[in-house]
Design a protein with these regions (language model features):
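Structural core of flavin- and non-heme-iron oxidoreductases
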Residues: 23-30, 178, 183
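A short, structure-level motif marking secondary-structure boundaries and short turns
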Residues: 2, 116-118, 146
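A glycine-rich dinucleotide-binding beta-alpha-beta segment and adjacent secondary-structure elements
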Residues: 145-185
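An anion/pyrophosphate-binding glycine-rich loop and adjacent beta-alpha core
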Residues: 16, 25-139
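Anion (oxyanion) recognition and catalysis
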Residues: 20
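Extended, hydrophobic alpha-helical segments in both membrane/secreted and soluble proteins
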Residues: 11-15
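A short acidic, glycine-rich active-site loop
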Residues: 2-10
Length: 185
């Protein structure tokens, strides 16, 4: 009744040492992120990009990755984010985009989300603002760069084509209707 990924006694870390010998680095994260795109603080937050395609920005307030809800895309992008900082950005119309992205399961995914948001905003784990500039200030990113990023992201939604990273049309969303939200990823 026990799973073992290696024969007993062979999990000694030799592969990690060999990787370091040829110049590899070791992540200084709280836990090995593997393929899961959430931080320790947001591991239970249902609006992480694992569940829905949202705008992802780095510490410069710029979009930096394909946000499709597929763990390897998100994890690779997040682990390579400048300054080890990234945010998932969305607006108050998230139920509409969730329904568009997941027509068969959106009701289940949205269950309890409003109450969860209230709790996480109160705890400081999720930021919210009625303005893009106010959200940028809370996130600590340059407001002008962030506003430009949001404007470009919204334009791609209107065009129905992601010309930057190729996110599928049905997975596109926009950041247009206040309040706006930022979740650390």
């Amino acid at each position: 009744d026990e799973n073992s990924y290696v024969p007993a006694g062979n999990n000694t870390g030799d592969a990690i040492l060999m990787t370091k010998w040829i110049g590899g680095g070791i992540s200084k994260s709280e836990a090995a992120p593997m393929v899961h795109p959430f931080t320790i603080a947001t591991r239970d937050c249902t609006m992480t990009p694992f569940f829905m395609t949202t705008l992802a920005v780095n510490s410069d307030g710029k979009r930096f990755m394909n946000e499709m809800p597929f763990e390897p895309y998100i994890t690779d992008g997040r682990m390579n984010a400048k300054g080890n900082v990234a945010w998932s950005i969305f607006d108050s119309d998230y139920p509409t985009y969730m329904q568009k992205q997941f027509p068969d399961s959106y009701e289940e995914k949205l269950e309890g989300v409003p109450a969860e948001f209230e709790e996480r905003v109160a705890d400081g784990e999720v930021f919210t603002s009625d303005t893009i500039e106010g959200l940028a200030e809370q996130m600590g990113v340059p407001a002008d760069a962030f506003a430009t990023t949001v404007e470009k992201f919204n334009a791609m939604y209107e065009q129905g084509k992601d010309t930057q990273f190729g996110v599928q049309e049905r997975l596109l969303s926009q950041v247009k209707t206040a309040p706006f939200y930022a979740v650390p990823i």
